[in-house]
Structure formats: structure tokens, C-alpha cells
Amino acid sequence: MSVEIVPLPLRINENESFLSYDDRLNRVVFKTSSGFGVVLLDDPEANRRYYSSDKPIIDAKFSPDLKYSAIQFSDYDIEILHLENGTRYIQTCKYKSSKATILGYYWTTKENILLVTNASLELYAMGLDGSCKLVKESKIKITNCVYSFNCNFGVLFLHSGGTSIQPYFFRTNSFDKLPKFNIEGNGNGFNIKNLYVTKLHEKFFCVYGDQEYIYLYEMTLETIYKIKPIKILLSGPNSIHFVDNLIIVHSELNISIVYDLKTIQRDRERGQTNKKEPEFPISAIPMTLSTINSNNLLYLMNNATKTHSTTSTPIINSINNNNNNNNNPSSSSSPSSSNNSQSSSPTMISSYEQRQIDQHKEQQLQKPNVTLYSKNWRFICPNYIFDPDSGIWYEVTLNFEKISNFLQFDSHKTIPFLQERTLLSAKFALLSIIKTIIEFKTDTLDGIGKIYDDLNKVLFRTTNRQLTESLHKSINQPNNNNNNNNNNNNNNNNNTAQTLNSTGNLSNSISIGGMNTSTDNLTTTTTTSSSISSSPSNSFIGNSKTNVNNLSYLNYKKQQQQQMEKQQHMPNDDEDSFSLIGDGGSGGSGGSFYNTNTNTTSTTNTTTSPSGKSNSNLKLSQSLNNTPNQSPNSRSSLNNSSNNINNNNNNNNNNNNNNNNNNHVVQNRQSRSNQYILINSHDMYDFVFNPIYEKLLIESQKEKEKENDNNNNNTNNNTNNNNNNNIEELNSNEKLELDSKYLIAVVIQYIKSLSFNHCTGISDKLYNLLISLLIDNNMFSRLHQFLQYYVITDSLSIAYKLLSIGEQYPPVLQLSLDMFKRLSMPNIIIETLLERGQVIQAIRLLRSTKETNEQAYQELLTPTYPIQFLASSSNQSNDTLFFSVFKFFETNNLIIPSHPSFDKYIKLFIEKFTEKSLSPLLLDILSNLNNNSTSGGDITPKKNVGGSFLNQSLNNSSPTLRSSNSLNSSPRLQYSNN
């Protein structure tokens, strides 16, 4: 695992000066000689919006809804500009007369702005006319402050000297004082710039770093919990970043050290750490510069499958060709032989996507000359670096490739660590580690089963929570909308319980699977306790997760995209979310890995499954937040000197498509929100089981080629040498067979874990793979047991596959027909029975379908539907059978003399049984046809309400014909059945 910096499209020009970065809006504010400007950090075009000013600007900030802009011109007042109508209002701090100066100002909500002076805290509410009204103040001596908006609330840390910190919690039109605490360490060297506010593993932390330790304080509304400090591996000046719930310490020794709080706590509980020694980091190596984002989907998919796709395709295709040429009935048992037109490579990349990958490779070869760990770098929380010398912005990210090198390949450490990550590269690394464990047998079956249980327990909890929350939202959505509107207009009491809503507009999904936003409300009561406890209580941010519903992934993805579009047009500052990656593919992605279109950055993963169906694909959505469209009028001291930035969805998509030459494929803030990865059955098949199975096929093909070469080369050798070679070949074949059986045990263990953990939506491709493995090893009795006891669930692909191997193992044919019956597919059963000459059984099923499911019966009937029954019965040289079949369809008015296809069988019936055996109704129709043909008339058969293709009804037939409404009414048929 390594720390990487990736250059962003944004460049700060020479005539521009960086002012601040707004983490909530993901916007960079800068000033120029004539005013200031703002730019969206994720905009590939880096489109700027400029505002001119005739005064020198100290700082500028935008409201969360991008409706107002607050500009500081002096130490005593700020100017608030309405960006839609251009009105402005100057607000002066209350204690200006006592020489109070502004230390900072912040938008706590879209309607509240906070002024922090060296003498007081002043919270103002915005009026409809743009004026400010003081709603709450607190007189306190302040020397410095740090403000953070995280998880729908703001927290201000005030420093008044020494190491004492006073936090405040802000909500609409009010704020509360939280328990005061002291920062440990050297008080003389305390620097407020080393104080950070972040969220780690769903908990809210205040983090302070000095040259030797990292001090962490978990914050709740009740009190502050001190966490045991982390001793830094390399002491000295440093800077701290937070990426993917990890703490990255950039040392002045040009080393980036990565710490995971949960891993450290696990080691402490196990007693594996020494109090006097530094904490063991996840990695400690220099950061690297990369022009390719290691968490880009195209990059990951290409790296995950490039070796496999280049080696397996020709060999698998040769296996398919051999099977087809030899007409081997067992060829259907191979997953790769199910569809010869599809490639067996797990990835089929389009030309557009391949061009992107090629461009990234060229850019990787042409890295710019950048001095890493420059002294002029500005480290901006949470994970950005600004280089003032070049004006380049970098994003700090993680590449989880070769993570096992840093954790000594301990699956008990590596897999839980990767499960708690959110980046795409972590999901690919986790799948790669599981594949390595299985392929090289580095763990026992019981150990692998425990790994499966860990994965599937998380999958079940998230899926179950998703179903519950979806139902809750669908029921309470109207009521919640009304309650939210009322809550925004009312003030909250200080002594009442506070509800922290943890959903947000910065959420988005990536399923290699899965992700709707969810809301978990945490109710806590504020107290004045200032004690520091040793164990945590209620989290300051609560719990909020988003999950993937594996049962309805496509519908979920549509809802997610609609929700993203709404959030882009309706910014909401009161929300933030914690969601999970699942089915993912995409997924799973998720979950799984899902489809590509021209407006998204994604790739198509198409693998030949045992059923011949292609794998699902992952969709990675990208979009940009809206920027204000209205400019202020000329009456303001600030004039808009640029055209409006068009950030609608269509133009954003076009920008993404037309900017293939960018060094960095930018994900928007929504896609970089906290999203735990999920591993489902689709992911396990696509990236673990199926690659191993195809490798076994490749090895098997190589062994066959060696055997053929040995036979050709050893024709002139003596008998002893031939016997030795045969023994060696038998040993190699036995090894392959054992490996294949081991894979069977591994797959069965995974299916068992899915079942025991109540995971639904298991991939049919997984069952197809298991069936193929059992057939390859001639384990038909085991396959029979799995089908008989419903270990393998019903699906059309499974039923078709069982039907295809009926010749190899006849008992499975009946099991496949039973599965088709449970799936309500009588047409397939009837066709199968007719192909095998079992006409009577097919007619009985047709009659049973008519009695039990009239709709399915009507769907089966076509004008020529009886032809296949008549053809099958006439080819069996059984006159009694042909008579019974013909009479059945004649009785049900399904014989259509006017249709040319029936002429052959009507003539055959008359030849064998004479015209007297025909019903009077059919004789009348035939006579009418003959008369009309001689007179030039035409009769067109019409389908009546009862399903008959004759104009006449069965009620018009003779009583004798009506009485023969059953096959069993014919003595000859009863005799033939016996």
C-alpha cells in the first residue's frame, strides 16, 4: 500500500492568490488584483467565476446554498452580497467600539453566519431583505479558532491560551457550549494549526498532532473521551491528512506514515503493542506521484484482468472449438463452452475506454518534474496539497495494491482492514487476497469459511438495513417533508434532546454494488460535564450507513441517479451521509461491476459464465455541483466580471466526455464520500472463482497438449520409457483433479456461508460454476443431492444447464423438468417431452395447464401449435397414438383445415382411419373449403374467445364428440398407456 498524489485540473495562476478551501462546498476561493473568484475543485475545465471589487479583500466565503457571499474588507465588518438580486448589506461586529477585531467568520447554516472576534461569538440570521439579525452571542476572550462543518453540524474550537480548548456546537439560530478539555503534550509548543476536526469510522474526533504523538479526542454532546495517543514512528515536524478513515502523517524526512485507529485498538486489546514503543503503522514509505488515479474504475478493471484476458482467451477458444468439432455431449458442462461468440476474458473494454487507458499510460511515462515534500507545500485538510510555486493542486489518495506486504499477509488483519475501507482499490485488493488464499491454499477450509462469514455478515446487515430503511422512507416520506419544513422555521431549545440527522447530499455510490442514503437518528442530551472518561459512549455523529439491495439492483441504481440529480439542483447544507459500496457489481459494486455508457467513467466486464451469460458491469457516475447563475447588479461594490458558469447536467457530461487528456479522472465529491465496500456473490464469481476455474481449464489443456506431444515423440522409444511417462502424466492429471475438487469444496463453503448468514440474491453464475465443476469430476450423485435438497436454487439458467446434460446423467433430466415446472415454464417441458417422443405426457401437461393456468394455456396456443404434436406422433409408427393425438386437438377445435400445415396430417388421418373417423364438424368445414375453392371464395380462420381457431364452437358439435373431451375416453389410448 502506498500514498499517492494525483494532480487535479485546477491551477492557480500567477495573478491569483489562494484564500481558502471550503470542504463543504468543495470550492476554492482565490483573490486577484481586481477582486476574487471561486472555482469548483472537481471541475475538469476549472471554470472560474470572478467578482470584481474596488477594495482590498481579506477573505471571502459562500453560503451552503450558494445564495450569499460574505466578503471581509476590514478587521471590523463584512459585506454580505445576495448573489441572485445583487443587494448587499454591511455587518459590523457588535463590540467594534471596544476595539474587537474579527478573527474569522463562518456560515454555520444556509441562513446563519458566525462572527468570531477576539472578544465574543456573534451568530446572525439572514433576513429576507438581506439584512442580518443578531440571534445569539457569547462574550469570551479568544486568541485563535478552528471551525469545521462535519455531518450536518458545525463545531468551533476556541483557543484562549495554554492548551485549553473550548468547543461549541452550532445548529440553526443557536449554539451550545460543549465540555472543555485540555490538549496533552508540550504546552509551550502548542500550535492551533495542528488541530484538526475529522470523522473516523463514523465517530467525530478532535485530532492534535505534535512532533512525537497524535492525540485523539472522541466528541459527543455529553462529554469528551480521551483516546490513548499514537506515538509517531518518526518524530519531528509533520503534517496530517485523513483519507479513507486513515491517518496519514507526512514527516519532514520525506516519509508518509499511515495509521489505522481500529487496527491499533485491536492490537492493544490483544496486547501486541508496547507502551514505550511507537505504534505499528500500516505503511511507512515515501509518497509517489501518479498521473493515474489508482481508484479509477477503468484503471482497476484493466489491471485486474489484463494478464488473465491475454492468456486465457485463445486457449479457452481452442477448447470450445475442440468440443464443437468433436460433438462431445459433455461440452455443455464447461462454462466457457456455453457461448462461443463471447470472450472468456472477464473484461471487454470498448475502443473509447481503451483510448482512455492508453492516454493514461502515455501520461504515466511523461510525469512532470515535481519536488515531493516541498517546504512550500500547503497541506489542506482533509486530503489536498497546494503547491504555491507551480499553482498545482494535488489530491492525496491511497493505492491498496500489495497491501499484504505491509501486514505480513495475515488474513485476520488484512481482510478486516480492507473491509473498513471505502476506496475502489481496496475492494480489488480484498478480492485479490481472497483469490490468492484459495489459489495457493494458504489457509484451511475452516479458515476460508471464517473469511466468508465475515464478508457475508456485513452483506446481510447492510442488505437487511436497506430493506428496512426503504420501507420506512416510503411510509414516512410525506410526514418527514412536513416535519423538516417546520423544523427549519423553529428554534431548538438548549435543554431539549438534539436529533442529529446523518444523511446528506454529498453521497454517491460505486457498486463493484451498492447505495441509497439512509437516516439513523441519534438522540442525545447536552450536559455541562467536563470530565474526560476512558471509554466512549454515544457517538457525536451517530450511525449512518447506506446499503445495497441485491434483489433489485437495477431499480436501485435508477433511484440513486434520480436522487443525485435532485441533490445537484437542490443543495442542502443540513445533510451528510455515510453510505456503503455494494452490489455491485458493482458493485457489487458492490457490488458487482456494471454497464458503461458514454456519460460515465466505467468499463464493461463481460465474462463467459457456465450458462453462457455475461457478467454484470459496474457503473461509476460523475457529476458536478451547481454554481450560482445570478450575478450582482452594478450598485454593489462587488461586480460580476465573468459569464455565468453553465453547470447543468448535460454540459457536465459533455465536459467529462470531451476531456480525455486530463491527467486526473476526477470523481465528484459525492463519489468520494464514505462508502464501505461490500463483497457479494457476483464479485466472488467474477474476480475469484471464475478466474481460478479458467486457470484450471488452461492447465488441463496444456496437459493434453503435452500428452499428445509425448505420444508423438515416444513412438520409437522402448516400453519402459513409455510406462514412466504414463506414470508421470497420471500423477499430473491426479494433481489437477485434486485442485478441481478443492475448488468445489471452496465454492460449496461459500454457498454454505451465504445460506447460514441469510444472504439473498445469490448469483446464478455461482451455481453454474458449481455444476460445471461437479460434471468435470463426474460427481453426478453429489449434483443430484444438491438439486434434490435445494442447495442449488431454481433459475432458468440452471434449468437449461441441467437440461443440456440430460444425456450424460439421465436422472438430472427429470430434476430439470421439475425445476421448469416450479418456474411456470410449461412450454419448455412440452418441447422437451416432444423431442423425446413422449407425446402422451406432453398432452397431459397441456391439458393440466389449461385447467390450472388458463392464461399460460392461451399463451401457448398458436395456429400451428398442434403441428409439433402431430409430427411427433406420426413419426413413431403408432397408429393408436396418432389417432389419439389427432382426436384430442380435433375435440378442442385446434385442427385448422384452412391452414396448409394441417393438410399433410388430415390426409394421413383419412388414409389410416377413413373420413368416417372425422368429426361431423370437421367434415363440414372440409366440404365448405372444397366448395369455396371451386367457387373462388376464401375462408380465413379466426380465433374465438375460447381459444379455438374455428368460427364454430364446440357447443355446435355432436354429443358424441362432446363426450370425448378426455384422452382417457379412448380405449386404445388407455391400452397404449399401459
UniProtKB/Swiss-Prot annotation:
Region (Disordered): 311-363, 474-546, 558-665, 703-727, 955-978
Coiled coil location: none
Record-level GO cellular component terms: late endosome membrane; lysosomal membrane; Mon1-Ccz1 complex
Compartment(s) where it occurs, according to its Swiss-Prot or TrEMBL record: Lysosome membrane; Late endosome membrane
Primary residence: membrane
Chain intervals with Gly residues compositional bias: 582-591
SUPFAM superfamilies per the UniProt record, alphabetical: WD40 repeat-like
Record-stated family: Belongs to the RMC1 family.
PANTHER family per the UniProt record, alphabetical: COLON CANCER-ASSOCIATED PROTEIN MIC1 (PTHR12897), REGULATOR OF MON1-CCZ1 COMPLEX (PTHR12897:SF4)
Purpose: May have a role in autophagy.
Protein name as annotated: Regulator of MON1-CCZ1 complex homolog
